[in-house]
Amino acid sequence: MKNKSNQGQAILLAALLLGGATSCFDDSYDLNKDIDMTINVGGENLAFPVGNTEKVTLDKIIEIEEGDDLQTDASGAYHLLKSGKIDDVNTRVEPVTVQATDTEIDPIEVANESDFEAAGSLEISTEREQNKEIETHAENVDEAVKEIYKLTPNTTPINIILTKEGNIDLKTLNAKVTITFSPVLEIKEATEGNKVIFNLTKEDLRNGDFTYTVHLTNITFGDGTKGNGRVIGDDRRVDISENVTVSIKADIVANEIPAGGTLTLTPTIHIGEMEVVQVEGIIDPTLDESTSSMELTGLPDFLENDETKLDIANPIFTFHANNPLNTPVEITGILSGSKNGQPIEGSEVAIGSGATDPIILQPGDNTIALSRLGEGGPEGAVNIEVSDINNLIQTIPDVVNVSIQPSVNSQEYYTVDLDKTYTVACDYDIDIPLAFGANLNIVYEETIEDLGGDLEDVDFSKAVLSASVDNTIPLALTLPDENVEVLDANGQKIEGIQVKVTGNIAAGNGTEQPVTSKLDIQLETTQPGTLNQLDAIKLKIVAASGGKEGLQLYDTQWLQLKDIKLKVPNGVKVDLN
């Protein structure tokens, strides 16, 4: 960005009309030798009217180039704008494997000699059952998992194997087999009560055994109420021990019953190794800290001056983040500024963690707007008041550093896919509207050059530059005496010149109706030949809000100097020798 200033030109016109009646002089008189041609012009009322300047609008003072961070919106309002991406935050929960298990249940004696004797027939009906605990476990459960409500494996087959034994000569067998699993083991094919029911015939057992396959879909602990899940201890192990009952209701017709004859079926429940793909429970994954930096470039000189102290009415830092987890993520962090590679003292601003309202990313897309007033964010944003956020930009940094630490603090159950990287993606928009508060202090330095001209032939001890100033810019401009330096052609300060500035430029109202002020800059010396060394004036102009807090800067606001006069109260001495 470049700044334009109208270079003041020192106009000292000695309109010296020396009468042409040379015939009144003796032709033999040597003017160059015998007469001192140093004369005094103007007395005490010498004044040179300079006139008026054109209206100087802010867009002439602040020239914006494409790509600069300072831009104007459609209305012409100045905004310091910056967009970019913050480093992604990643997390994952490592996979869990539940070990394979074979549970052999005690043999079920479906029929024996006594059953037939009691019936007095070769045709009987019986009902028998056995039960046992299915035991397995998982080790090395990820540290993030605090309590498990549900484990979801890849669909895992459960083989129910019935092995026939005994010496009863069967004519027919029609059996109804009911396997009742614990509600912890959710079976895809189960009916109400988590029962698996199938029929078994003599033909099914012709090879001595029969296998019926069902599928395990979930291992569910508790009743879904927080605290009723399986809490994981320091050993990071989950032990599963759940009851299974096998009931066989059989209709049997025998050809013959040998002495001591029996028919037994031995159930074996085989569950293969399970790769758990999803966990539901209380899960506290570790989320990486994210540190990023944003560079502010192409700023005008008055913003980059080390003495400038900004007081922005409502700067807004907007963050857009996608939370891929099925639970809220809380954000805490530090924003800070640095300049020329060094931290700016006092620029740190804490967010979240008690410093502000909690900053919560709900599952899915989020827009969080951090601002001084807690308002003004884009539509749909959650506005968070950060009352001290101006500290970050009070001294305008060339780099804004962002350090954020996401965390999951939920004590509610939610679901996480295992062996999957979750990425919290985040980008930002900075919008600093140039509407200032009461503590604004902008310092703008400008040098008005090439004022010397032919001043070596003119000697004067006092000069006053006076003007009437119309201002619509909502900034009050002051020029303290000590902020005016008179320089010679070598750029060195000329000593012995006293500067007195009378009046200030009052702030405009931000409307087209100007506020008018009077301004005098007086230069005076007691040392002859001093002021005529003047070649440049260096000004350090201080801008403040001037009681117009919150008014926005627009590129159409303007300032105009009228009735400009250069007064030389004691006249000038012109050397015509």
Residue map of PLM features:
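Extracellular/secretory-pathway and virion-surface proteins
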Residues: 24-577
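Hydrophobic helical h-region of N-terminal Sec-dependent signal peptides
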Residues: 12-18
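Bacterial N-terminal signal peptides that target proteins for export
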Residues: 2-11
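Short, well-ordered helical secondary-structure segments
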Residues: 11-12, 553
